[in-house]
Amino acid sequence: MNIYNKVTLSVILVITIVISFLFYFLTTEKKVDKDTLYENKIANHKQSGNQKNYGVASNNAIATKVGNKIIEDGGNATDAAEGVAYALAVTEPHSSGLGGGGATLTYNGKDGEVPKMYEYKTMSSYNYKQGDKIGVPGFVRGMHDMHEKEGKMDEKKIFNYVIPLAEDGFEVDSELERSLKIYGSKIDRNSPFFKGSKTVREGDVVKQSKLADTLKKIRDKGP
Protein backbone atom coordinates (compact mmCIF):
# COMPACT_ATOMS: atom_id res chain seq x y z
CA MET A 1 0.00 0.00 0.00
CA ASN A 2 1.52 3.33 -1.03
CA ILE A 3 1.61 6.49 1.10
CA TYR A 4 -1.30 8.05 -0.81
CA ASN A 5 -3.58 5.10 -0.12
CA LYS A 6 -2.56 5.06 3.55
CA VAL A 7 -3.38 8.74 3.93
CA THR A 8 -6.69 8.29 2.13
CA LEU A 9 -7.61 5.35 4.37
CA SER A 10 -6.67 7.32 7.49
CA VAL A 11 -8.83 10.26 6.41
CA ILE A 12 -11.77 7.94 5.73
CA LEU A 13 -11.38 6.35 9.17
CA VAL A 14 -11.26 9.74 10.89
CA ILE A 15 -14.35 10.93 9.02
CA THR A 16 -16.18 7.71 9.89
CA ILE A 17 -15.33 8.10 13.58
CA VAL A 18 -16.43 11.76 13.61
CA ILE A 19 -19.72 10.91 11.90
CA SER A 20 -20.31 8.07 14.37
CA PHE A 21 -19.81 10.39 17.33
CA LEU A 22 -22.08 13.05 15.82
CA PHE A 23 -24.79 10.47 15.16
CA TYR A 24 -24.51 9.23 18.74
CA PHE A 25 -24.85 12.67 20.29
CA LEU A 26 -27.66 13.72 17.98
CA THR A 27 -29.72 10.58 18.53
CA THR A 28 -29.04 10.04 22.22
CA GLU A 29 -31.56 11.91 24.34
CA LYS A 30 -30.66 13.61 27.53
CA LYS A 31 -32.36 11.44 30.12
CA VAL A 32 -34.66 13.16 32.57
CA ASP A 33 -34.53 12.16 36.21
CA LYS A 34 -38.24 11.51 36.64
CA ASP A 35 -37.93 11.53 40.43
CA THR A 36 -37.30 15.28 40.18
CA LEU A 37 -40.50 15.95 38.23
CA TYR A 38 -42.98 18.11 40.10
CA GLU A 39 -45.73 15.50 39.72
CA ASN A 40 -43.64 13.03 41.73
CA LYS A 41 -42.67 15.57 44.37
CA ILE A 42 -46.32 16.09 45.27
CA ALA A 43 -47.33 12.44 44.93
CA ASN A 44 -46.59 11.36 48.50
CA HIS A 45 -48.39 14.12 50.32
CA LYS A 46 -49.72 13.62 53.82
CA GLN A 47 -52.99 14.97 55.10
CA SER A 48 -52.23 17.90 57.41
CA GLY A 49 -55.54 18.02 59.22
CA ASN A 50 -56.73 21.12 57.37
CA GLN A 51 -59.47 18.96 55.89
CA LYS A 52 -60.52 15.76 57.64
CA ASN A 53 -62.55 14.25 54.84
CA TYR A 54 -62.16 14.99 51.16
CA GLY A 55 -61.82 13.37 47.77
CA VAL A 56 -60.44 14.59 44.46
CA ALA A 57 -61.08 12.89 41.13
CA SER A 58 -60.27 13.81 37.53
CA ASN A 59 -59.43 12.24 34.17
CA ASN A 60 -55.71 12.54 34.83
CA ALA A 61 -53.69 11.19 37.76
CA ILE A 62 -51.29 14.16 37.79
CA ALA A 63 -54.13 16.68 37.91
CA THR A 64 -55.69 14.73 40.77
CA LYS A 65 -52.40 14.97 42.68
CA VAL A 66 -52.49 18.74 42.24
CA GLY A 67 -56.01 18.91 43.67
CA ASN A 68 -55.07 16.73 46.63
CA LYS A 69 -52.03 18.87 47.35
CA ILE A 70 -54.03 22.10 47.28
CA ILE A 71 -56.51 20.78 49.83
CA GLU A 72 -53.72 19.31 51.94
CA ASP A 73 -52.17 22.79 52.02
CA GLY A 74 -55.36 24.38 53.30
CA GLY A 75 -57.35 25.13 50.16
CA ASN A 76 -61.03 24.32 49.76
CA ALA A 77 -62.87 22.35 47.08
CA THR A 78 -63.11 25.36 44.76
CA ASP A 79 -59.37 25.97 44.99
CA ALA A 80 -58.73 22.31 44.23
CA ALA A 81 -61.17 22.34 41.30
CA GLU A 82 -59.41 25.33 39.74
CA GLY A 83 -56.00 23.74 40.23
CA VAL A 84 -57.18 20.47 38.70
CA ALA A 85 -58.74 22.28 35.73
CA TYR A 86 -55.54 24.18 34.95
CA ALA A 87 -53.46 21.03 35.45
CA LEU A 88 -55.66 19.26 32.89
CA ALA A 89 -54.96 22.09 30.44
CA VAL A 90 -51.30 21.11 30.73
CA THR A 91 -51.49 17.32 30.90
CA GLU A 92 -54.62 16.62 28.84
CA PRO A 93 -54.34 18.96 25.82
CA HIS A 94 -56.51 16.71 23.65
CA SER A 95 -59.52 17.35 25.92
CA SER A 96 -58.78 20.53 27.88
CA GLY A 97 -57.23 23.92 27.27
CA LEU A 98 -57.13 27.60 28.17
CA GLY A 99 -59.21 28.54 25.12
CA GLY A 100 -62.16 26.34 25.99
CA GLY A 101 -65.38 26.90 27.87
CA GLY A 102 -67.29 24.92 30.45
CA ALA A 103 -69.62 24.93 33.41
CA THR A 104 -69.12 24.34 37.12
CA LEU A 105 -71.62 23.24 39.75
CA THR A 106 -70.67 24.17 43.32
CA TYR A 107 -72.22 23.33 46.67
CA ASN A 108 -70.70 24.07 50.07
CA GLY A 109 -73.09 22.04 52.21
CA LYS A 110 -74.59 24.92 54.17
CA ASP A 111 -78.16 24.44 55.34
CA GLY A 112 -80.73 25.81 52.96
CA GLU A 113 -78.26 26.71 50.23
CA VAL A 114 -78.87 25.47 46.71
CA PRO A 115 -76.02 24.48 44.36
CA LYS A 116 -74.59 27.28 42.21
CA MET A 117 -73.89 27.03 38.50
CA TYR A 118 -71.08 28.94 36.78
CA GLU A 119 -71.23 28.80 33.00
CA TYR A 120 -68.52 30.02 30.64
CA LYS A 121 -69.11 28.06 27.49
CA THR A 122 -70.39 30.46 24.79
CA MET A 123 -68.26 30.12 21.67
CA SER A 124 -66.82 33.12 19.81
CA SER A 125 -67.58 31.71 16.38
CA TYR A 126 -69.77 29.02 14.89
CA ASN A 127 -67.80 29.01 11.66
CA TYR A 128 -64.87 26.91 12.78
CA LYS A 129 -61.44 27.79 11.51
CA GLN A 130 -58.39 26.31 13.13
CA GLY A 131 -57.43 28.41 16.13
CA ASP A 132 -60.20 31.03 16.01
CA LYS A 133 -62.90 29.33 18.06
CA ILE A 134 -62.50 30.12 21.75
CA GLY A 135 -64.75 30.32 24.76
CA VAL A 136 -66.23 33.73 25.68
CA PRO A 137 -65.91 34.65 28.49
CA GLY A 138 -64.05 31.36 28.45
CA PHE A 139 -62.25 29.01 30.78
CA VAL A 140 -59.80 31.50 32.29
CA ARG A 141 -62.43 34.11 33.19
CA GLY A 142 -64.84 31.42 34.33
CA MET A 143 -62.32 29.95 36.75
CA HIS A 144 -61.46 33.40 38.06
CA ASP A 145 -65.09 34.38 38.64
CA MET A 146 -65.83 31.11 40.41
CA HIS A 147 -62.77 31.50 42.62
CA GLU A 148 -63.66 35.08 43.55
CA LYS A 149 -66.99 33.91 44.93
CA GLU A 150 -66.13 30.48 46.33
CA GLY A 151 -62.35 30.19 46.71
CA LYS A 152 -60.28 30.39 49.87
CA MET A 153 -56.62 30.19 48.83
CA ASP A 154 -54.85 33.07 47.08
CA GLU A 155 -55.47 32.42 43.38
CA LYS A 156 -51.86 33.23 42.48
CA LYS A 157 -50.75 30.42 44.76
CA ILE A 158 -52.99 27.97 42.90
CA PHE A 159 -51.09 28.71 39.68
CA ASN A 160 -47.84 27.86 41.42
CA TYR A 161 -49.06 24.27 41.78
CA VAL A 162 -49.60 24.02 38.02
CA ILE A 163 -46.86 26.04 36.31
CA PRO A 164 -44.07 23.52 37.12
CA LEU A 165 -45.98 20.86 35.16
CA ALA A 166 -45.61 22.97 32.02
CA GLU A 167 -42.20 24.45 32.77
CA ASP A 168 -40.34 21.43 34.14
CA GLY A 169 -42.38 18.82 32.30
CA PHE A 170 -44.72 15.95 33.02
CA GLU A 171 -44.70 12.28 32.13
CA VAL A 172 -46.93 11.26 29.21
CA ASP A 173 -49.55 8.62 30.01
CA SER A 174 -51.11 6.00 27.73
CA GLU A 175 -54.24 8.08 27.08
CA LEU A 176 -52.28 11.07 25.79
CA GLU A 177 -50.09 8.79 23.67
CA ARG A 178 -53.19 7.22 22.10
CA SER A 179 -54.82 10.59 21.34
CA LEU A 180 -51.64 12.00 19.82
CA LYS A 181 -51.35 8.99 17.53
CA ILE A 182 -54.90 9.59 16.31
CA TYR A 183 -54.63 13.36 15.83
CA GLY A 184 -50.90 13.69 15.21
CA SER A 185 -51.42 14.75 11.60
CA LYS A 186 -53.19 17.90 12.82
CA ILE A 187 -50.39 18.94 15.20
CA ASP A 188 -47.48 21.22 14.37
CA ARG A 189 -44.34 19.09 14.10
CA ASN A 190 -42.46 21.75 16.08
CA SER A 191 -44.75 21.35 19.08
CA PRO A 192 -43.51 19.76 22.32
CA PHE A 193 -45.70 16.75 21.54
CA PHE A 194 -43.43 15.62 18.73
CA LYS A 195 -40.10 13.92 19.16
CA GLY A 196 -38.45 13.96 15.78
CA SER A 197 -41.00 12.79 13.25
CA LYS A 198 -43.20 10.91 15.74
CA THR A 199 -45.53 11.93 18.53
CA VAL A 200 -44.35 11.40 22.09
CA ARG A 201 -45.03 8.08 23.77
CA GLU A 202 -46.03 6.92 27.24
CA GLY A 203 -43.19 7.58 29.65
CA ASP A 204 -41.72 10.49 27.69
CA VAL A 205 -41.42 13.85 29.45
CA VAL A 206 -43.04 16.87 27.78
CA LYS A 207 -42.10 20.46 28.59
CA GLN A 208 -44.27 23.37 27.43
CA SER A 209 -42.33 26.58 28.02
CA LYS A 210 -44.74 28.81 26.08
CA LEU A 211 -47.71 27.49 28.04
CA ALA A 212 -45.78 28.05 31.28
CA ASP A 213 -45.18 31.68 30.25
CA THR A 214 -48.89 32.11 29.51
CA LEU A 215 -49.87 30.69 32.89
CA LYS A 216 -47.43 33.06 34.59
CA LYS A 217 -49.01 36.02 32.80
CA ILE A 218 -52.50 34.94 33.90
CA ARG A 219 -51.22 34.48 37.45
CA ASP A 220 -49.51 37.88 37.57
CA LYS A 221 -51.92 40.02 35.53
CA GLY A 222 -55.24 38.23 35.88
CA PRO A 223 -57.64 36.99 33.18
Predicted regions and their residues:
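N-terminal Sec-pathway targeting helices
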Residues: 1-15, 22
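Surface-exposed charged/polar residues within alpha-helices that form helix-capping/stabilizing sites
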Residues: 68-69
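Activation on terminal intrinsically disordered regulatory regions flanking enzyme cores
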Residues: 15-18, 32-34
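Noncatalytic scaffold domains of N-terminal-nucleophile
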Residues: 24-65, 77-223
